[in-house]
């Protein structure tokens, strides 16, 4: 039976360590500061932002919320980003996605100062990642790597298959895996013989947002399975992209949904906010 990779326990440890680091930074008059820009009133975004603020408050990160109305123009949003870029007291900027229709997300991402880009979405951050240079990366991939590390799962030399090619998970995770000496394949909706490809993976990452997309017939015995997806079934129950009940008996390790990758994402956001604050403190 697979070991369950407990993201709640690992993230709790990360946050406790960060709280200690933040207390030490405070002795040097440094307070990690995260600016969150929320445009409109998307219910899911409201929940995500509230969770981020709660975690920030718990560990001593200063979290500033900038709410903008649904009717915000592109020019007004870019002006707010520019204002935050030039504020010397702000270490990290996060514009909560998705943005309302009519706003150009990529233009907004491009406008964020790469040295404050805590999401790691800017072209400069992406370039640094693929050049294997120190950089901030998207929180979910960062969290996945931290979770694997916590369980001493070494990716070097492993065959990694990532199903999903989003800029939020699949692509940046591929970069991190390559930088840690894994052999990586990204699969997607146009990939042929997807199940056979998945079954060749030593580490299988699934991020497609389709409940129980992967079953036992697509997993190699002994594989590590990372389930990034989260959906609600007809009964309201949270479901992952992987059928855990079917896959757990043959995998060596698996992330549960909920309680696997999800908690690691916010912990990673906090960790990288602290990293950016340290850079500011060190000039």
Swiss-Prot record:
Xref: InterPro entries: Aminoacid_DH-like_N_sf, NAD(P)-bd_dom_sf, THF_DH/CycHdrlase, THF_DH/CycHdrlase_cat_dom, THF_DH/CycHdrlase_CS, THF_DH/CycHdrlase_NAD-bd_dom
What GO molecular function annotations does the UniProt record carry, in alphabetical order?
methenyltetrahydrofolate cyclohydrolase activity; methylenetetrahydrofolate dehydrogenase (NADP+) activity
One GO cellular component term noted in the UniProt record for this chain: cytosol
Q: What single Pfam family name could you report for this chain, choosing any that match? A: THF_DHG_CYH
Q: Keywords assigned by UniProt?
A: Amino-acid biosynthesis, Histidine biosynthesis, Hydrolase, Methionine biosynthesis, Multifunctional enzyme, NADP, One-carbon metabolism, Oxidoreductase, Purine biosynthesis
Coiled-coil segments, which residues? none
Which reactions are catalysed by this chain?
A: (6R)-5,10-methylene-5,6,7,8-tetrahydrofolate + NADP(+) = (6R)-5,10-methenyltetrahydrofolate + NADPH; (6R)-5,10-methenyltetrahydrofolate + H2O = (6R)-10-formyltetrahydrofolate + H(+)
Protein name in UniProt? Bifunctional protein FolD
């Amino acid at each position: 039976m697979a070991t369950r990779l407990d993201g709640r326990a690992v993230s709790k440890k990360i946050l406790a360590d960060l709280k200690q680091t933040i207390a030490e930074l405070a002795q040097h008059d440094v307070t990690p500061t995260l600016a969150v820009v929320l445009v409109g009133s998307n219910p899911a975004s409201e929940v995500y932002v509230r969770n981020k603020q709660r975690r920030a408050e718990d560990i001593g990160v200063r979290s500033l919320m900038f709410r903008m109305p649904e009717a915000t123009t592109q020019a007004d949003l870019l002006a707010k980003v520019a204002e935050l870029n030039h504020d010397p007291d702000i270490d990290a900027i996060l514009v909560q996605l998705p943005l309302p229709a009519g706003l150009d997300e990529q233009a907004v991402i491009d406008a964020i100062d790469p040295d404050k880009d805590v999401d790691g979405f800017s072209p400069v951050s992406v370039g640094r990642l693929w050049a294997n240079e120190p950089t901030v990366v998207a929180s979910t991939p960062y969290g996945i790597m931290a979770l694997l590390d916590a369980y001493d799962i070494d990716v070097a030399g492993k065959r990694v298959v990532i199903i999903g090619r989003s800029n939020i998970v699949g692509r940046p995770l591929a970069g991190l895996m390559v930088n840690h000496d894994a052999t990586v394949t990204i699969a997607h909706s146009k990939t042929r013989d997807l199940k056979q490809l998945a079954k060749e993976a030593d580490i299988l990452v699934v991020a497609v947002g389709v409940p129980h997309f992967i079953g036992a017939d697509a997993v190699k015995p002994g594989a590590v399975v990372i389930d990034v997806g989260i959906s609600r079934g007809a009964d309201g129950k949270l479901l992952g992209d992987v059928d855990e009940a079917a896959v757990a008996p043959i995998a060596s390790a698996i992330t549960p949904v909920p309680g696997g990758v999800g908690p690691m994402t916010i912990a990673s956001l906090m960790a990288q906010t602290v990293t950016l604050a340290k850079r500011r403190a060190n000039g």
